[in-house]
Design a protein with these regions (language model features):
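Amphipathic alpha-helical segments of the small helical/lid subdomains adjacent to P-loop NTPase cores
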Residues: 218-225, 232-306
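The conserved Walker
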Residues: 46-47
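Substrate-engagement module of ASCE P-loop NTPases
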Residues: 150-158, 184-209
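Extended alpha-helical interface modules used as scaffolds for assembling large macromolecular complexes
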Residues: 229, 294-481
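Conserved lysine of the Walker
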Residues: 51
Length: 481
C-alpha cells in the first residue's frame, strides 16, 4: 500500500511539510521561470492561496545554510533532478509584515522592533560568514535600518549575495488605511514616511527581492521609492503558480484513496465535480482564458479532504468556518461599511448579475480606491472577482464560485438586517419546511412582509430597486435553493 501522508492544512512551513511527510503539491517547476524574470518581483494573490508556503519553499531552495541538504529536501520534487545554478547561493532574510500587529499607536516603533528581531536572527543564522565585530555591532544596534546597513556593507565587501523575501508586505498598511484613514497612511508611505524609506533601503541592499501580498494599493504608494519592482501577478506563466489545478486535485485525492486514507470506493471524479462549483474557477490572466484550465483555492480543497478523511464523505458545510475571519478582514480592507452609493451599486450589481465589465488596473494608489472605476480591480485582487471573458478592450469579471457568492449575499444580507432584523433561525426553519413539505406560503409571506419594511426605508440601500437581490440574499441561507 502507498505510504500515508498528512494533510498540510494550515501549514506554511515548507521544511516542516517535507520532514513530517505531509502532502506537497509540487510548485518547484516555477523556480526557473521566476529566475528568468527581473530580480525584484511582486506577486499578488487572495488569502488562502498558499503564498506563505510558496515563499517558505523559495527560502529553503536558495538558503546557502542548507545547500548541502538539497537532495534530502528537494530530491522527490521536480527541481530535485534539475536544480538551477542559483540553488543555495544566498543568505536569505524573510520578513512577514503580518507580525507587525497591535494598534496604531507606536507603529513605527513596533515595526522597528520587529525588523530588529529579524535582523538579529539573520546575523545569528549566518554568523559563520561575519566577523565578531560586525556581529556585535548588529546585535548592539537599536535602530533596525542601521542593522541592515551594517549587514549590507559587510556582505557587499565580501561579495555575499542576499535574498529578501517579504510575506504580506501590505498587511499592516492596509489596516492603517482602513482604521486610521488616508492621512495617517499617506504619512507612512509617502515622502519621508518610515515604510517607504525602508523600501528605498531594500532596493540597494539585496541581490534579489520577492514580495507577496493581497492588495496592489500599498504597492503603488511605496514603489515610487522602490521603483524597480516587477509585477508578475497577471502574467500567464504564473497564473497557476499558487492554488491547485484539477490535475493537482485529482492526483491528491487518488493518492489518499490508494493509501487507504479515504474510502476505497471513493469516486474521485465525483468528488472533483462536487468541489468545483465551490472552490474552483479562478483565472488571474487574460491570456489564460483560452486554456480552460482554472485554479482551485488550495486551502478550501485541503479543508474538504481533511473532512473526507474523518467522515468518509464531504463536509456538511462546504465553506471552511475559518474563512469567516478572512471575510471580516476583507470587509475591513474593502471598507464595505463605508461604501458610497456608486460602490454599493457595484456590489449589488455583481451580486444580482454575477459579473461586471471593467478595466483591470494593475496598481492604483490609496487615494483612488474610492473611485468606482477602480473598485472592481480591488475586488479582483481580493479574490471576489475573477477573469471570465473579454468585452472589447475590457474584461468581464465574474464571481468565481459559490464560496465567494455566499460572501456577496452575506454582505447584502447584513445591509438588510441593519434596516430590518429577521430571525434567521425562524426563517431557516421555514425554508426547510418549504423544501421538504411544500409549505411555500409561509416563506413568501414572511419575505414579502420583511421586504416591504426594508423598502420603506428610503435612505437605506435603495431596497425598492433590489427585490431580486433581497430574495437571493436570504434564499441563499439554505443549501436547497
Amino acid at each position: 500500500m502507498i505510504e500515508a501522508k498528512r494533510v498540510p492544512y494550515g501549514v506554511s512551513d515548507f521544511l516542516r511539510v517535507i520532514r513530517e511527510n505531509q502532502y506537497y503539491v509540487d510548485k518547484t517547476m516555477y523556480i526557473p521561470l521566476l529566475e528568468a524574470q527581473p530580480d525584484n518581483l511582486i506577486f499578488i494573490r487572495p488569502r488562502r492561496f498558499g503564498k506563505s508556503l510558496f515563499l517558505s519553499m523559495l527560502e529553503a531552495y536558495y538558503d546557502c545554510k542548507i545547500k548541502d541538504q538539497f537532495q534530502e529536501i528537494f530530491g522527490g520534487l521536480w527541481i530535485g533532478s534539475q536544480p538551477t545554478p542559483l540553488q543555495g547561493k544566498y543568505q536569505v532574510l524573510t520578513l512577514d509584515f503580518s507580525q507587525v500587529g497591535g494598534n496604531i499607536d507606536n507603529l513605527e516603533e513596533r515595526f522597528n522592533s520587529y525588523c530588529n528581531i529579524c535582523f538579529d536572527a539573520f546575523i545569528n543564522r549566518y554568523a559563520q560568514f561575519y566577523d565578531e565585530a560586525t556581529r556585535k555591532t548588529v546585535l548592539a544596534e537599536d535602530v533596525a535600518s542601521n542593522k541592515l546597513a551594517t549587514i549590507q556593507k559587510y556582505a557587499k565587501e565580501h561579495n555575499y549575495q542576499l535574498y529578501l523575501i517579504i510575506d504580506e508586505y501590505d498587511n499592516f498598511t492596509n489596516t492603517v488605511l482602513n482604521e486610521q484613514g488616508e492621512k495617517v497612511y499617506h504619512a507612512m508611505t509617502h515622502a519621508s514616511g518610515f515604510y517607504r524609506d525602508y523600501f528605498k533601503k531594500f532596493k540597494g541592499s539585496f541581490a534579489k527581492i520577492f514580495m507577496m501580498g493581497v492588495s496592489p494599493v500599498t504597492l503603488d504608494d511605496v514603489t515610487s521609492g522602490f521603483n524597480i519592482g516587477w509585477h508578475i501577478s497577471t502574467k500567464p506563466e504564473f497564473d497557476k503558480m499558487l492554488g491547485f489545478s484539477t490535475e493537482d486535485v485529482r492526483a491528491m485525492f487518488t493518492r489518499y484513496r490508494d493509501a487507504g486514507q479515504i474510502p476505497a470506493d471513493s469516486d474521485i471524479e465525483a468528488m472533483i465535480e462536487e468541489i468545483k462549483p465551490w472552490y474552483d474557477n479562478y483565472c488571474f490572466s487574460e491570456a489564460c482564458l483560452n486554456s480552460k484550465v482554472r485554479v482551485f483555492n488550495c486551502d478550501m480543497v485541503l479543508y474538504y479532504l481533511r473532512n473526507y478523511m474523518d467522515d468518509g464523505k464531504a463536509p456538511k458545510q462546504m465553506i471552511d468556518p475559518n474563512t469567516k475571519t478572512d471575510y471580516n478582514k476583507m470587509k475591513r480592507l474593502l471598507q464595505l461599511d463605508k461604501l458610497d452609493g456608486n460602490r454599493k451599486g457595484i456590489i449589488r450589481r455583481i451580486t444580482e448579475e454575477g459579473s461586471i465589465v471593467s478595466n483591470l488596473y494593475e496598481t492604483f494608489p490609496a487615494s483612488e480606491i474610492v473611485k468606482p472605476e477602480y473598485f472592481p480591480s480591488l475586488l479582483f485582487y481580493y479574490g471576489m472577482l475573477t477573469i471570465k471573458d473579454t468585452f472589447g478592450d475590457q474584461l468581464l469579471l465574474g464571481i468565481p464560485n459559490n464560496n465567494v457568492r455566499r460572501q456577496y449575499y452575506g454582505y447584502l444580507q447584513e445591509q438588510y438586517q441593519e434596516i430590518n432584523h429577521i430571525n434567521l433561525n425562524e426563517f431557516g426553519y421555514m425554508l426547510t419546511c418549504m423544501a421538504f413539505y411544500g409549505k411555500w406560503e409561509d416563506v413568501l409571506g414572511f419575505m414579502s412582509k420583511a421586504y416591504a419594511e426594508v423598502a420603506s426605508v428610503r435612505d437605506g440601500i435603495e431596497a425598492e430597486r433590489n427585490l431580486q437581490g433581497f430574495f437571493m440574499a436570504y434564499l441563499y441561507l439554505s443549501s436547497y435553493y
